[in-house]
Amino acid sequence: MSKMLDDLYLPDGKRLTTQIVGKPGGGKSFYLRETLMSFLKKNDDPDYRLLYICPKQEMRLGEKDIPVSVDKIAKNMRKNRATIFYPNPYDVEAEVDYAIELMFDMQQQNEGFKATIVVDDAQTFISSRKAASQAFRRLALTGRSKGIRFVAVAHQAVFSKDLEGSTSYLVMFTLPVKLYHKDLNTRYGLDVEPYIEPISSKPYSFLWFDVTKGKAQLYDPIEV
């Protein structure tokens, strides 16, 4: 489990983006919450920070992790290792871009600073139909070298040139419809056909695909 947590979230300058994919009800949110809490417990680096960006305004990690608005992110970061950010739904894209750029500013101003930025509903901000903002391009393409790890949470694998070449792991709780099987194989090298029946027959199980090594592994639901 320890290696899985590091593969998911650790900003070590080696691992690239993690995509955690699944439709509502597939177990994705539970997995996120439990693995993030476990990672925070095991990682005692005082210079580490987690920023969870949740446009749906649903994620809570614990009773002490009170969600904040955009103007409270920096203050909360100074005091707490984890910050849950609920962007204003009427200005969501601008606020999310600001939050990402703020993390890069903090990295420049604080020696040893390391962070994981989890973006829920990532398909809203980066997809094949929409060019990524400068902030998201910076996060996806240069975050690793700055000690900032990107974790994209989406309903399905994100098809975007900005993300395809900078993804280390796909963690899939539901598999895409047949229409997208070819794209997934072409862009990430994953053939999902052998895993459709096992995933669908065991609720909350998931497929872990190492994009760099081209290796896939099925996992049973995590135990708490």
Feature map (PLM): residue ranges:
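Conserved P-loop NTPase motor cores
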Residues: 18-38, 56, 89-192
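Pre-Walker A (Motif I) flank of P-loop NTPase domains
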Residues: 12-18, 80-81
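Conserved P-loop NTPase mechanochemical-coupling segment
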Residues: 75-96
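Walker A/P-loop NTP-binding active-site region of P-loop NTPases
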Residues: 21-72
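Pre-Walker A adenine-sensing motif
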Residues: 1-13
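Short glycine-/polar-rich loops that comprise or flank the Walker A/P-loop
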Residues: 46-48, 80, 146-148, 165-169, ...
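Phosphate-binding and hydrolysis-coupling loops of NTP-dependent motor/remodeling domains
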Residues: 181-224
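Short loop/helix-cap segments at secondary-structure boundaries that form the rim of catalytic
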Residues: 58-65, 75-79, 160-165
